Amino acid sequence: MKIVIAGGAGTLGRDLVKHFATQGNEVVVLSRRNVSVEGARVLVWDGRSVSEDWARELQDSVLLNLSGELVDRVPTKANIDLLERSRVEPTNTLVQAARQFGTPKLWLQMSTLAIYGDAGDQILTEASLPANGPRQMAGVAKAWEAASADASSIRKVILRTAVVLQPGTPALNRLVRITKLFLGGQVASGKQWVSWIDYRDFIRALDFIMKDESLNGIVHVTSPNPVQNKTLMRELRRALERPWSPPTPAFLIRVGARVLFRTDPLLALTGRRATPMKLLERGFHFQFGSIDQALKDL
């Protein structure tokens, strides 16, 4: 089987390549940079224009579209424009390429649970409606999904994905760093829900989706056990052998996230309580179902 991964040169992409290549699949990575990715052929593209050099690879492939800049940045208009453009432009280009050079047998379109905005205690399923939330969250996600609406493929799955817990990612590195400095208390009330998935379960879930042809449309790729922020921080302190730390007030998060960490405070102050209904109904088993299991390897 040929698997084409757009945006597959990042941390998560490289682990996906390793997994799929080990299974004997042919893996092609589309990257804006001329880099080496073990287990894959790397084809350079600009994400904006169609070239036969890479577009011909789409015919009868499994296409996984991971394209997009990290959300871990201050939410200025310029940065939000970048977040949206880095997702929408490559997706539009892939849609055009599939029309011109050949239809993938499966289109896996990355998306995010942030499409639901700040959902409070509401339990979110694949039937839940997107929210009119902050543009950098719900707005970008809706534009991203809309760009793939006319994708030409035999089967298409929109992967509304939780926070992927993977060592080495910027957001998790920051949480580990501040917790090691004895600053790992809950954020604000600590009641905001965190939907998450261990990166190994994320990879296994994609494998499962590829093989189960009854899965299509929106699929939540998230652990069945979301936790509140206060639980996440407690388990992180436990994993790193740190004592209780005082809560961080919301106003300090709003200032500190922007000034000290150059990131979006809403990443910590908003939450979503999602469940992977379709995966559970099809019998998918999560190996890392509890947050303490996922944090053991930090």
Where are these regions (language model features)?
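Conserved Rossmann-fold NAD(P)-dependent oxidoreductase catalytic core, especially the SDR/UDP-sugar
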Residues: 92-133
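Mid/C-terminal beta-alpha module of Rossmann-like enzyme folds, strongest
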Residues: 205-262, 296-298
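Glycine/proline-rich active-site loop of Rossmann-fold NAD(P)-dependent oxidoreductases
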Residues: 154, 165-174, 209-219
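A conserved pocket-lining segment of Rossmann-fold NAD(P)-dependent short-chain dehydrogenase/reductase
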Residues: 174-201
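Active-site Tyr-X1-5-Lys
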Residues: 132-156
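C-terminal amphipathic/interface module of NAD(P)-dependent oxidoreductases
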Residues: 211, 227, 243, 265-298
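N-terminal Rossmann NAD(P)H-binding glycine-rich loop of SDR-like oxidoreductase domains
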Residues: 3-23
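NAD(P)H-binding glycine-rich loop region in Rossmannoid oxidoreductase-like domains
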Residues: 35-36, 41-90
